[in-house]
Amino acid sequence: MEEITINIDKIKINDDWKEFLRDEFQKKYFLEIKKQYLNAINQNIVIYPPANLIFNAFNLCPLKEIKIIILGQDPYHQPNQAMGLSFSVPKNVKIPPSLNNIFKELQNDLNITPAKSGDLSSWAKQGVLLLNSILSVEANKAASHSSWGWQEFSDAIIHKLSNEKSGLVFMLWGNYAKNKEILIDNTKHLILKAAHPSPLARTGFLGCKHFSKANEFLKKVGKIPIDWKIV
């Protein structure tokens, strides 16, 4: 079998994150992700988000500025939705139900008028890592890449951030995200847990006040709070 190697200098990810994740990019599981990705592309299978946006969460959120991690599951699988940021959709795209509930909670919590745009890039640029546990999906097939190995990659990121940083906020919404709590050192970081914001989930997200709690914690550890208004 032909050996697959990865030239990390060609991976579209900022230098700070590239160095931070260098070891992960060389591990066997990541080589398998690359192999499956290339096989799908060669079969003309449509994958979301586009290749240049797969690592968008890292490219918009500088490693040295990271303050908050909001963990999603996998990208939106309909056309023009996925942009490499958990829960976010590009400007002029209809706001999905889960994001609608996030905006409702922002209004309840901080009196922020619900945004007309679902693009959360302004959060990312302030240090909010909008990380999906699975970073790609086949068009129209939810969770279709759940067996590729992406979870090992995102778990490694969470664990490494927990070990090497201090004073971070991890927002874990829904049982899938809550299961990642074991990767996080709760003596160094704030872990905020709630139900998933999806309207299909049981009640428990609306009223969680995670956005104000996160900002209070950031101020307590000497960091600038997040401006949650969508720009």
Swiss-Prot record:
Main location: cytoplasm
Catalytic residues in the record: D74 (proton acceptor)
A Pfam family of this chain: UDG
EC number(s) reported in the record: 3.2.2.27
GO terms classed as biological process: base-excision repair, AP site formation via deaminated base removal
Subcellular location: Cytoplasm
Keywords: Cytoplasm, DNA damage, DNA repair, Hydrolase
Catalyzed reactions per annotation: Hydrolyzes single-stranded DNA or mismatched double-stranded DNA and polynucleotides, releasing free uracil
GO cellular component: cytoplasm
Domain of life, per lineage: Bacteria
Enzyme class: hydrolase
One Gene Ontology molecular-function label: uracil DNA N-glycosylase activity
Family, as annotated: Belongs to the uracil-DNA glycosylase (UDG) superfamily. UNG family.
Function: Excises uracil residues from the DNA which can arise as a result of misincorporation of dUMP residues by DNA polymerase or due to deamination of cytosine.
NCBIfam families to which the protein is assigned, alphabetical: PRK05254.1-1, PRK05254.1-2, PRK05254.1-4, PRK05254.1-5, ung
Name the UniProt record assigns to this protein: Uracil-DNA glycosylase
Organism: Campylobacter jejuni (strain RM1221)
Underlying gene: ung
